[in-house]
Amino acid sequence: MTTARPVKTRNEGQWALGDREPLNDTEKIKLADGPLNVRERIINVYAKQGFDSIDKSDLRGRFRWMGLYTQREQGYDGSWTGDDNTDKIEAKYFMMRVRSDGKAMSAHTMRTLGQISTEFARDTADISDRENLQLHWIRIEDVPEIWRRLESVGLQTTEACGDCPRGIHGSPLAGDSLDEVLDPSPAIEEIVRRSLNNPEYANLPRKYKTAVSGLQDVSHETHDVAFVGVEHPEHGPGLDLWVGGGLSTNPMLAQRLSVWVPLDEVPDVWEAVTQLFRDYGYRRLRAKARLKFLVKDWGIEKFREILEQEYLNRRLIDGPAPAPVKHTIDHVGVQKIKNGLNAVGVAPIAGRVSGTTLSAVADLMEQVGSDRARWTPFQKLVILDVPDDKVDELVTGLDALGLPSRPSSWRKNTMACTGIEFCKLSFAETRVRTQTLVPELERRLADVDAQLDAPISVHLNGCPNSCARIQVADIGFKGQWIDNGDGTSVEGFQVHLGGGLGEQSGFGRKLRQHKVTSEELGDYIDRVTRKYLEGRNDGETFASWALRADEEELR
């Protein structure tokens, strides 16, 4: 009789288990020098000596912690995308990500962003679906001056990227919404105060995304950690804790810990979850290093047990689940807020604006007496504190800038990532393409728009990373370089259908072996929308129909 040899557990680089040896190149870079230290080199060395002086481990590693990615060299289509061609497609310019952390921006702040864009970024500016503003064509020589101007108005790019707590999602109407359970702004401010520029949290296993909102308006199910407003029958208003969300190539929705957290304890609980991720998170394979993989392997009960016993030293209060929302809360349009004034939400196509536009928005804000505005998680802009007698004036002025507050459903519900215009990871054009796709859909589907009981969301992403949240859209497109049917390859997309959040949370379905070329996007959306209207049952949503429809109907 032979004794079975014990199975050796693979070293996943979990610090809490004593596995401190770096197991991939990024972990080695972080160990060699703390990522936050690169700021001084940017200011004192690279900005003075130019792009060619930048050390590669800083350029492709630590720069991310300063909100900087090199952008794609112009003229290289999706066939060039891949690690083997990084040297060829990497331009000597940067995308700079400016985080907002749910803060309201004054007219002066908005104008400062506009001026930075026009002076240093060739008038580019994109509102991301993480409530950030992204600028392009940034030269390393200009970074210190841009930082100086941003920081003078309370903004920063620090840790807008990297293996660290990214910018925090907060409600665009935090403290203002008539429907919020509570205003969590103090908790967000305290989390940022504790975490930003803190070496204790600057070396997490992977990116770490947080949402804190008194409303379900921040896509909380797709975050690593999220706190959502909920009313406890005994304890009153507080927040419901979710962990383990994230999309990309292994999408997972966050799960409830079934606990109720009072507002003043949110920063402590957030730190405990973050420390747990730092210590127990996987650091061997980058593709398996997000918190969601740990939550999946442990299960939610073990996660809560370790959180309470090892990090909080107390038991959390059991809490009720918030009722899931039926429709996306995007804050587009005009609505009353708590102070009796109005919020006006507008919809640029897929978040694309410009420095010139932002400066003009600042002028309009001052003209109508508003001094607060926020980005949204759906690539929109909301202007707050607008008096009743100034709403029409503001709406007219914003319309003239291409920022409608009464947009078509297609404009309102289309999102896109950066795409091949600037992103080295992309296989397809996305944001630029939406600028013509949305008007095309408005024209082609005008005859059936009134038949849509609820709008159909369309999300375009240039690669599998799902920055534009394609798996939770009614119609999601994932960029690929595809066979054109004649032996050649062209830019195209894999189709995802029937995803959603809230009451219909799920990832929908992927059509097997069905790809759509970029030129066919309008045709495809037109075709599948009309088939839905022909084949739906009474009151049936697009997502529900898409999940049950024959695959042939969806092609």
Swiss-Prot record:
UniProt keywords, alphabetically: 4Fe-4S, Heme, Iron, Iron-sulfur, Metal-binding, Oxidoreductase, Thioether bond
First-tier enzyme category under EC: oxidoreductase
Molecular function terms, GO-annotated: 4 iron, 4 sulfur cluster binding; heme binding; metal ion binding; sulfite reductase (ferredoxin) activity
4Fe-4S in keyword set: yes
Reaction equation(s) it catalyzes: hydrogen sulfide + 6 oxidized [2Fe-2S]-[ferredoxin] + 3 H2O = sulfite + 6 reduced [2Fe-2S]-[ferredoxin] + 7 H(+)
Cofactor(s) required, per the database record: siroheme; [4Fe-4S] cluster
Residues given in the record as [4Fe-4S] cluster binding sites: 417, 423, 463, 467
Cross-link 3'-(S-cysteinyl)-tyrosine (Tyr-Cys): residue positions: 69-161
Binding site for siroheme: 467
Family: Belongs to the nitrite and sulfite reductase 4Fe-4S domain family.
Subunit relationships: Monomer.
Purpose: Catalyzes the reduction of sulfite to sulfide, a step in the biosynthesis of sulfur-containing amino acids and cofactors.
Protein name in the entry: Sulfite reductase [ferredoxin] 1
Species, as recorded: Mycolicibacterium paratuberculosis (strain ATCC BAA-968 / K-10) (Mycobacterium paratuberculosis)
